[in-house]
Structures are given as C-alpha cells and as structure tokens.
C-alpha cells in the first residue's frame, strides 16, 4: 500500500474508533467501574454470593472493555508515529511495520464496531443455547452434533467458558438435542443471530446407496436469567421427573436417578438436565433454563402486543443458513447472502464473519 493511501486508511480508522468511543462512552463506564470497585471493597460482599458474582463479573467486563479501547487508541497513535518516520526518511521498514499493524487494527476495529450494534435489552447477557435435530432422521441427529461441535469450537476460539447442561443422544448416531450456557459478556447478543433452522445437504454416510440427503437442525438462543428479572416459578406449577442419565447409543452413564426433567404445567414447556453430578444440581440447572424460556416467552408476548415483533430470520423454525457439502461445498446465510466455500473451517468454529453479517443485517432491519 502506498504511503498516502496508508495515511488515509489510518485516518479513517482513527475516526471510526472515535465514533465507537462516542457510542460506548468510556467516561461513563469508568465512573461505573469506580462504583463497582467500592462495592467489591465491602468486607461482607460475598455474604450474598449471587450478587457478588454479578458485581465482579460486571467489573471485569467493564475493565476489559476500557483496556481494549485504550489499547486500540495507543496502537493507532503508534502507527501515526511510524508513518511520520516513513514520510520523513523514506523508511521502508517503518512503512512495512505500519502496514502490518494497520491490517490488524482494521480487523479489530471492525469487530468492535459490530459490538456497538449490540444494544438490545438482554444483549449483554450470557447465552443459553439449545440445538435440536429436526427433519432428516439419523442425518439430522448427526448434523445437530456437528453444529454443537461448531459452537463449542467457536467458544473455545474466543476463550469463552461453556457449561453443557444436557445432551440427549440419538440411538444410531448424533444427538437429539443439547443445551449449553456460554459464559461470556454479550454472548446472547452475539449468538442470537444464529437462531433458526440450519440445513445440511450432503451424501449421507448412513445411506448404503450413497444418496444425497437434506437434513435440518434447529438452534434456539436465550438470555441467561438474572435475579433482577424476577422470574418466579411456584413449585405448584412444576412437575418434576427423575431418570437415569444416558450416553451415546442409550447407554446409562450412572446407576442413580440423577437426571431431572421439569415440566412447566401452565405452558407445557419441558426442560431436562443430566450433566451435573447430583439430582439437586440438575434440577437447579434445569430451572435456570426454564426461567430463560419463560423470560423469552414473556418478551415475545410483549413485543407482539406492541406489534413490533420482527420474526423474519430470527424465529425458531425460520430457515437461516444452508451448509452444502455436495455437489459443491458452500455455506450460505440466507438472510445476509454471506457465503464461504471452506466448509471445514466453518464446522471448526470459524463463524465470526457470519455472526458479524447477521448482526449488521439485524440492525439494518430494525432501523428500516
């Protein structure tokens, strides 16, 4: 890149970062950090462990956000200095270093710009994700497991902690369903664009005649419920069933009735959990998921009443992405038209570009 072009690119990045700072308001966040630090300093903070966890998690997230902004600002200033050296002394080494750093800065600032689009009521929350096999028999169950691995690898790439709450294995291969929590700030806002029906087209490895098979799996994304949401569920509204936890092929993984299934009688919503060690832990985990589902149900009802529910591409069951492995290889988002030919990379968790495109698409539809 020529020096003059590089200088303009850096000026544009500088302006983009300033716009991001205006949206994120770092000074307000620093004031909130100071308040949270005062709360953390209180000796009896951990007497209320749930509140303490909320305070410390929020503090860590804000500190990381401020550090990220300050680091980007410092790096842009460093590039300005390198460009001054390159212009004054025809320093090719400084120009090369500035070029490399500018490419990295563009990627990071673009990603941060997408983050500023996450301003929904629950976007800052952690996420509860459920994957279910749909039409397509054993291929659908196998596809559901492929999607589970994809999201686990995506979380791993970002350093996010994942807690698997429940896995229901199919008899021949794959899974009937799986539910997990992504413990990361803005996990809900980020992953909510993945909600919908995903379609796989391939030569079925389970078909002796090697025929092409189309199968489907559904992804549901909910925000983790917090204490301030006041989602109270009377015991009288619950039916609690206990059963043996099972593994692949229907194998029992323990000899006690530790797995728990909760049925919310007023709505008919059913949630199960079998991955914790005890019945008490499984019931608590299942209750968290049930609360998240009830919170989402209330939110959808409220939006419907306000006649503002935008269901295209976001609703459970709306087809949103196709994964074609035969006769060619292509993953395509049906809402944004973003597509990638490297299907192996996608199934290995390289889906940030799809998520970013989905977030931009959602914001555009919200503002149109």
From Swiss-Prot:
One of its GO terms (cellular component) is cytoplasm. Keywords: Cytoplasm, Methylation, Protein biosynthesis. Coiled coil: none annotated. Methylated by PrmC. Methylation increases the termination efficiency of RF2. One of its GO terms (molecular function) is translation release factor activity, codon specific. The keyword Endoplasmic reticulum does not apply. It is found in: Cytoplasm. It comes from the Bacteria. SUPFAM superfamilies: Release factor (SSF75620). Its main location: cytoplasm. The modification N5-methylglutamine is found at residue 251. Peptide chain release factor 2 directs the termination of translation in response to the peptide chain termination codons UGA and UAA. NCBIfam families: prfB. Belongs to the prokaryotic/mitochondrial release factor family. This is Peptide chain release factor 2. It comes from Cutibacterium acnes (strain DSM 16379 / KPA171202). The lineage of its organism: Bacteria, Bacillati, Actinomycetota, Actinomycetes, Propionibacteriales.
């Amino acid at each position: 890149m020529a020096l003059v072009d590089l200088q303009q690119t850096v000026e544009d990045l500088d302006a983009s970062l300033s716009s991001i700072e205006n949206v994120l308001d770092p000074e307000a966040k620093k004031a909130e950090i100071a308040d949270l630090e005062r709360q953390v300093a209180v000796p009896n903070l951990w007497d209320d462990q749930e509140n303490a966890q909320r305070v410390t998690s929020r503090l860590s997230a804000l500190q990381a956000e401020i550090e990220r902004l300050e680091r980007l600002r410092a790096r842009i200033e460093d590039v300005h200095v390198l460009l001054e050296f390159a212009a004054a002394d025809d320093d090719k080494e400084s120009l090369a270093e500035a070029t490399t750093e500018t490419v990295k800065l563009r990627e990071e600032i673009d990603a941060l710009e997408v983050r500023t689009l996450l301003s929904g009521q629950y976007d800052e929350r952690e996420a509860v994700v459920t994957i279910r096999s749909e039409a397509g028999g054993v291929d659908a169950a196998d596809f559901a497991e492929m999607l589970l691995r994809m999201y686990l690898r995506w979380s791993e790439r970002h350093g996010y902690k994942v807690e698997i709450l429940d896995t229901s294995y199919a008899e021949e291969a794959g899974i009937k369903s799986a539910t997990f929590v992504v413990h990361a700030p803005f996990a809900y806002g980020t992953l909510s664009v993945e909600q919908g029906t995903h379609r796989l087209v391939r030569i079925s490895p389970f078909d002796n005649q090697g025929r092409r098979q189309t199968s489907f799996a559904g992804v549901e994304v909910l925000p983790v419920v917090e204490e301030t949401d006041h989602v109270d569920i009377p015991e009288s509204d619950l039916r609690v069933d206990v059963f043996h936890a099972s593994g692949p092929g229907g194998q029992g993984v323990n000899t006690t009735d530790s797995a728990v299934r909760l049925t919310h009688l007023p709505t008919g919503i059913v949630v199960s959990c079998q991955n914790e060690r005890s019945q008490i832990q499984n019931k608590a985990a299942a209750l968290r998921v049930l609360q998240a589902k009830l919170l989402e149900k209330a939110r959808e009802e409220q939006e419907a009443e306000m006649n503002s529910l935008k269901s295209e591409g976001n609703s459970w069951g709306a087809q949103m992405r196709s994964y074609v492995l035969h006769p060619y290889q292509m993953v395509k988002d049906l809402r944004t038209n973003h597509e990638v030919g490297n299907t192996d990379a996608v199934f290995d968790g390289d889906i940030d570009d799809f998520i970013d495109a989905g977030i931009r698409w959602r914001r555009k539809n919200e503002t149109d």
